[in-house]
Amino acid sequence: MKNYQQLWQSLTPLYDAGEAQAIVRTVLDAEYGMTLTDIIGGKVNELSADEGKKLEEIITRLQKGEPVQYVLGQADFAGRTFHVEPGVLIPRPETAELCQWIAETQNENLKKEEAIIREEFSISPDVALEDVNLFEGKGWFKRKYLRLRFLVKMLHSYKKARHTKLASPRPRIIDLGTGSGCIAITLSLDIPNSEVVGFDISDSACNVATKNAKQLASKAIFYKFDIFDMPEKCKTDRKNHLKADIIVSNPPYICEKEKADMEKNVLDYEPDLALFVPDEDPLKFYRAIAEFASLELRSWGMLYFEINPLYEKETREMLEGFGFKDIETKEDSFGKKRMMRAVKS
């Protein structure tokens, strides 16, 4: 049986030393519950014959370039563990940053709106005293009038607060191209009282997403649907209107010409359908989603994308063409323009 150093060194033809070590540590943790202290202490050498055989099989698959997430059948995302399998895109850290941006924006806006409502609903002592002094000593009719006046003020304050359109306390969220369900499930768990629906064209993806929702106690639900059919169905049949507060998507956005710069294990194992777009039409999915969002978002609803940094300008202009406003781009932790948000007017 190979020791820890021999295990990670066997992967260096494909990965640098740091990445090879991280992969082997991930395997030892997921399969055998070993901590870094256990590994340094030589616990790898204490594996049984059956455990050692299984580890060798895992290393053999890794040596062929198969992603460790597919080998283990799981991937960590936003502090949770998701089931993944071939045919479903492996969740990326950058996508977790998109989820964090959405959840933080929603929760912050909800707090702002609640503060506005509290402020608007509070009647100042001066106003209250004015009302009391005006009708003090008056009869039953005057007291009734005072109550009515107070209620009218309250109603006006409520309408004024709700007119801010900052956030819905029970937001409806649609995730298009849901894959493993990582975005939909994360938002359903991180945004209280949210109603989340995910769509994907792949049966396999919908099945995996449903499995993850059950495993993680999420109420997100998933359906098979083609993004390119959705705008037309919304136009022709009112029954298909979903009316969301938030629509989010991490659609395919890598051009064929970019393949030369990609890792072999991604090209060989992850689904092309979830990754690539034609060189001549890099915004193919974004246009369909933007059109759908222009129909299905409520007024002041928000559309979020993970984007290709190479086409940030074109994506922004496309959204402006569909009437979106307040378009904002956000960099990921690697300093790339990876996320975009737009508001429906």
Task: State the predicted function of each range.
Residues 1-77:
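N-terminal auxiliary segments of SAM/dcSAM-dependent transferases
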Residues 1-9, 148, 234-237, 345:
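Short, low-complexity, intrinsically disordered N-terminal peptides in bacterial proteins
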Residues 4, 24-25, 55, 68, ...:
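A general structural signal for well-ordered alpha-helical segments in protein cores
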Residues 6, 10, 26, 54-57, ...:
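Alpha-helical elements of Rossmann-like donor-binding domains used by nucleotide-donor carbohydrate transfer enzymes
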Residues 31, 35, 43, 62, ...:
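A general structural signal marking secondary-structure boundaries and capping sites
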Residues 43, 56-131, 135-192, 196-211, ...:
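SAM-dependent Rossmann-like transferase core, predominantly class I methyltransferases
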Residues 51, 91-94, 285:
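An acidic site on a long C-lobe helix of protein kinase domains
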Residues 190-344:
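S-adenosylmethionine
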